[in-house]
């Protein structure tokens, strides 16, 4: 993933330094001593920003260097393709080194489309908590879908292979924050109902523009929402809600297949989750992924792991990241990789 630092590095670091980073990330060459120049990433996730960077301190996000992101869309509806220049630098370098695919993802709609004019929701906008967590105005779902499809087409026309676009990130998380205080990043939650509205609109826009790009669903903040009611009924049981046409429960009004998305042309049978928080112990690594894989298999759904880094505390062998040795960190990542690949049988794995 190019979040959070790649835009800053690509814009402001020296050519030699950022070229060196690109080589380490993307090169597949072997030097004269038989050593690999880089790790040869085959896929690169690109954050499509919502415009908090242009707002400056008014964005309410204190971290101005990493967590504010530019937006290609201007308020008047025109596009500025010179935005996110640092990220585009690394996209170009990835393509030059032979990176096969690019996945676009977004954390928020453009601020022009949000309820509070910010790139994250704030508390109190609605008496309905689930409406409060969602920051996209009802009248702008089609506009947001048009924006995402337009950005996708732009980069496809630039020669990038973009097999997937992910329009929603970690809907289970309550992104409501206090501007200028605890707002850490762009974010927006979507219930199953809101997800279906947005995904259906994006499916239609991708089709209108003649794009082969598909929609990547899920981006669950951990593995449990894939198969159970872990994070609230309006944000969980993703396999059943999106890929089981006969599924009904309290959270879809006992209406069979109310939020089914498996019949949309640009929705493949894929769900993705993040390996955060289920990485502390061998037992949690194994159990959550076994259950996710078992549920996915029932409906022919492939699983992807699309984000992981060390966010947790109370690991088996150490308290937290700062207390860990380099070997502790290496073994923790190896355990996550093992269980994601061998237990969850993921078809794709991405580091945050």
What are these regions (language model features)?
Residues 50, 171, 277:
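Flexible, active-site-proximal loop/turn residues at the rims of small-molecule/cofactor binding pockets
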Residues 146-159, 163, 174-352:
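Substrate-binding and catalytic surfaces of secreted/luminal carbohydrate-active proteins
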Residues 106-107, 167-170, 219-220:
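Short, well-ordered beta-to-alpha junction loops that form the rim of enzyme active sites
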Residues 1-163, 175, 182-192, 196, ...:
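N-terminal catalytic cores of secreted or lumenal carbohydrate-active enzymes
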